[in-house]
């Protein structure tokens, strides 16, 4: 299947392995749409958050994710002649909601479990990571570190694999994610993430402003974090039925009997580690439409916080196309 697009002069399965195009063609031959995410975490550390966000979002629904990259030695030199590909089938994530630097829960992933045909199922790729300053630029050591503008070395994320050379570990430099999805799922993780980050940044500005006015205590008391996951309608309703925080039976019944599309994006908002709000987006809509089909506020005494966001001058103009903001305005009446 992967080689079906090749001309007669080309080998169907070359000795050098499959190219990215071959893999994408194989996914399409199964009547699925491949979502391609290119990442270069050595040149931009923020791209790791995008990569981990995609893994967290799609893997929860059982979507197998193909990860390609290059194996490197500890000194940054390449190992082997070509790239390497693995299938991600799990991860481990820090359950630490007090980390104010993480706006997305997915950024707490610190280990991937992958199927590596040369190691076996559930081989691990662990992250060795320390804080990176916002003004850091890439150092030529290919992912081993970054250097701040003042020249002081800072340790950067390295992906340590179970591969080794003469007892020394090899490191993985990710290049591409290929995510096979049903073609009716038109809204991507990136579509949702952009709107979520827009709301999160607006909240950050509002909270700082209120703290300056003395209307709010220290910022550490208001840590906002977001979870973005693809769900089926059945899985979503099952989670609603078993959710102890939705304690009013009429609220549960309304959601269990609601007509919903088959595929949904479930967006949860946590404040200080406690779930605060839920937004559900139609994943089968167009990316530019992105309809919010359900929303729920868990604690009524927190609604004032959301109203601050709505009432802050300029937010309505800036987020005129943000469907989450529009849903908040609708709920506020």
Predicted regions and their residues:
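Conserved catalytic-core surface of thiol
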Residues: 113-217
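C-terminal accessory extensions appended to soluble enzyme cores
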Residues: 208-211, 218-241, 249-252
